[in-house]
Amino acid sequence: MAGYLFVHFTGEQKDGEQIYFSVSRDGLHWTDLNNGKPVLYSHIGECGVRDPFPVKNPMNGRYYLIATDLRIEKGEGWQAAQERGSRDIIIWESEDLVHWEKERSHTVGIREAGCVWAPEAVFDEEEQAFLVFFASKVKCDGEETAKHRIYAAYTKDFVTFSDTFLYMERCLLYTSDAADD
């Protein structure tokens, strides 16, 4: 079937913070796969995922799916998730978008980060690597309160990553919000 794949989570209910797939031929009418049940589960970290982002490696054709390691449904709420949440991303890998390797995690958040949320990745031709960027809530020296900043790291294989660095200082939670400015 040629068309669109929608990779998503459904909310904060039981099994809502897992990975669901839906497909569409026209981008308007969608069919849930796997009878509307999660296609992928996270059994590591917080045992829940949000903000899934699929990406294809242009060098070898492999697919990667990265997501926020977060489970609000069983946790202490949003405030705790921002201040004491996971600093990991959850990663799945596939050759065909059907068969997926067991999930793994990687710590990309800096030591001072209260969370790592909404990871996305783009392939940087110049670096011949993926730039993985994400929001982290960090309190910097001289600040009264922590704020979300965008950090990033490079990876060629989603196994080893460069050191994490501050990518964008603007107060954004999702980098797609920057398009509105």
Stretches with model-predicted labels:
Residues 21-23, 88-95, 151-155:
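Beta-propeller blade signature
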Residues 102-124, 134-141, 146-151, 167:
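Asp-box/WD-like beta-propeller blade repeats and closely related beta-sheet repeat scaffolds
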Residues 2-5, 61-65, 127-132:
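Entry beta-strands of beta-propeller and related beta-repeat scaffolds
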Residues 50-53, 117-120, 176:
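Beta-propeller and closely related beta-sheet repeat lectin domains
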Residues 174-181:
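Conserved small/polar residues in nucleotide/adenosyl-binding loops
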Residues 68-86, 137-144:
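Short, conserved, GDST-rich strand-edge loop motifs in beta-rich repeat architectures
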Residues 30-42, 99-109, 157-170:
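Blade-edge beta-strand/turn elements of extracellular beta-propeller
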